[in-house]
Amino acid sequence: MAASIAAATASAALQQVVARPAPVAGWLTFGGSGARPGATASTVGPLRASWFAPLAGTVTSQPLVARNVPRKGDTTVYVATSAGFVYALAANGYVRWRVDLGRFVLPACPQVPDGWGVTGTPVIDPATRTLYVVDAFGRLHAFDLATGAERAGWPVVLYRDYRRELVWGAMLLVDGAVYAGTGAYCDLPMEGKLIRVSLADRKVSGWTVVPPELGGGGGIWGWGGVAYSPRRDSLYVVTGNAFEGGTNKGAAFSEAAGYGEHLVELSPGLDVRSSDAPAPTGFTDLDFVGSPVVADPSGCDELIVAQAKNGMFFAWNADDVPSGPAWSLKLQKADPGAPLLTQPTWSSRFRSFYVATASKLVRIRLDAACKPQIAWQTTLGDATLYPSPTVAGGNVWLGLPVKDLSGVAEALLGVDAATGRVKVRRPIQGVSFAPPTVVAGTLFLASMHGLDAGGFPLARGRPASALDAYQSASDAAHRWQSREDGVYSTEDGGRHWHRIYPRYAAQVLRISKTTGLISVGSPATSCGCATRQLWTQNGGKSWRSAVVGQSYTASRGAVYWWTDNTLFLAAPNLRSSTRIAQTEDTIVSGTPVAGGIAALVDRREKAPQVILAQGAGTRLITLPAASPNTVVRTIRGIGGDLVVRGTSVATSTADPARVEWTSKDGGQTWSAPS
């Protein structure tokens, strides 16, 4: 008996070891690590056609890549968009999961075309296999890497005044805490903050850059957010200018009041350890809008480097920040119309920093005496904003948002890190402002039109899929490739392919430039993803297109669809569409009703509205008012009733309250919100 018990115990132990998931590795935070170097030893081989995934919303954050998720040997790419969507994509572009966190539209600040959803790059905790991301309403979410399910007790509210504060930069994960810095919308009044959330108890604490009595301001704007030095166990942020107000006004006004326009070193508990405000040079707007980078050059002191809008590159000795910059360089002319807005990259292999200015890619090399030298400058072309570069192997990679000297626009550039020679120039879909991500020889680049893998969109071939292909007679007639994990379409005989994601299990539209909307069908998946819409208003002479989410519904053979604030009815032959309603605010959802559609309009600080389109008649119905902090999401037919659902985003830190309106007469009248 003892022997059999021992054997059973050994077997159970063996099963435990086998079942333990493989460790998560990859590119888990902005820049590859908390130091924000933006460099990796991984090399990128010859670029080849791969895949292009159209996403709902503009992408300004860096894609993250986790290997061994969801299973050993798998790779998953995580991308967040300004429309408030977070995607988990397989290595072949297949959508594993997607969540909609909502977006905030602020007409006074239209810097991002889709409104404000997720701007800062999320961070991955490999130990708990969790993705942390902040939405536009100041909520820090925790999602299971494999499933997208929210962890128990989350989200946590970081700040409640989401109309004045925004997390611009990347999250940082250090020793059981997540950090996020806040800025504002278009320099609207606010107080910049560094916020800490303890993952063990979800306790929120913060440090204010410039207190209100000094006028506030001091936003933490940089794409890299907060940097971390393991050697000093310190956090580093650089800040924007203080605003005029309180005692900081008149002749006493200073943009460096409080900790405005400073490099600040803080403990993990948010106590200030040291700081410095460099003297202004050029125009006085010395905002730091890149993020600090921690560099560890062999044989030299550890450096903290950052760039300012006036074209200056500063380097501080990490052990002596208060003494001011150890050295500085002027990289471009001080120009308010084309400020230096990018993030530097550090390569220990080449002992060099790489910076994209308003017109050039610059290599700053540290010599044997630890002195900076401009090794080379490669002209790129004039642009207001370049993305930050990434060093992978022997090349520097970055997106090109304007035409370069060869006339190529919207391209991925590969530049020799040693010589500055342009070795690779590949066209991409749309402008890219995010640094490339390189893992295991594959390059992922987020653009204003979606995500490119391998550096450019699908070309000369069909995309890879995890599932077997299925092609209907209609697909063959229109030269479309349909797959169970989505719909792919071609508009040029197969040279390029477009993937169209279904939104609901019961509906999918197949579309093309030549025939418009041509079918409504049932895909074999319940994947909730984005949909590419093309439409014509002149009988097919010209077409417009957009990538949007949750944007159409079919009602007894009629197809209704919407983009932003306009509702359309497709013609019976589906070759054109007619505009049937237009609002001042955003249409977010729709559902079939008798003889037509009920479409939900989100008006943020006002009561939501419902467009009721039935037959030839259209009515605009205003629902009973709810809290101004309510965001409406969906309208659905449930058990014979129509139900509008929303969320109060400032009610509870752990369980945001759901708000509902109900109509029992097909949308004519509505109950007060509950």
Which stretches of residues belong to each language-model region?
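Conserved Ser/Thr-centered positions that define the repeating blades of beta-propeller domains
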Residues: 420, 490-491, 536-537, 569-571, ...
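N-terminal "mature head" segments of proteins
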Residues: 40, 461-501, 506-513
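Secretory targeting and sorting signals
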Residues: 1-13
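Repeated scaffold domains used in trafficking and secretory/extracellular systems
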Residues: 61, 120, 164-169, 224, ...
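Trp- and S/T/G-rich repeat-edge/linker motifs of beta-rich repeat architectures
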Residues: 459-464, 495-503, 538-548, 575-583, ...
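Short beta-strand elements that form the blades of beta-propeller/WD-repeat-like
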Residues: 77-79, 132-133, 303-306, 352-355, ...
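Short, solvent-exposed coil/turn segments at beta-strand boundaries
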Residues: 73, 127, 175, 347-350, ...
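Extracytoplasmic/lumenal domain signature
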Residues: 17-25, 30, 37-59, 66-79, ...
